[in-house]
């Protein structure tokens, strides 16, 4: 089985020109971007549920959570993790959008 780098080299060798290779890579990046946007929508829905349940927006929540003001409820750890995942995916989306 070929590793990823070998597959990329094979793809590069078999494309007729750089324009074709750029188009193929662009299509792959677009697929990844779509998946990331779908994940973001799920994270946003889940975060919104926490905000409604605790009547607190996520920015206020993060400040209070990091300051130790809130308790150790499992919900708070899940909410915080979702906020971190959301931030990470936003960075990835931004990079992909710049590349496309």
At which residue positions do the language-model features occur?
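Amphipathic alpha-helical coiled-coil segments and their boundaries
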Residues: 22-25, 29, 36, 65-68, ...
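Short, compact, well-ordered microdomains
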Residues: 72-100
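Amphipathic, hydrophobic secondary-structure cores in small proteins
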Residues: 50, 54, 60-62, 75-79
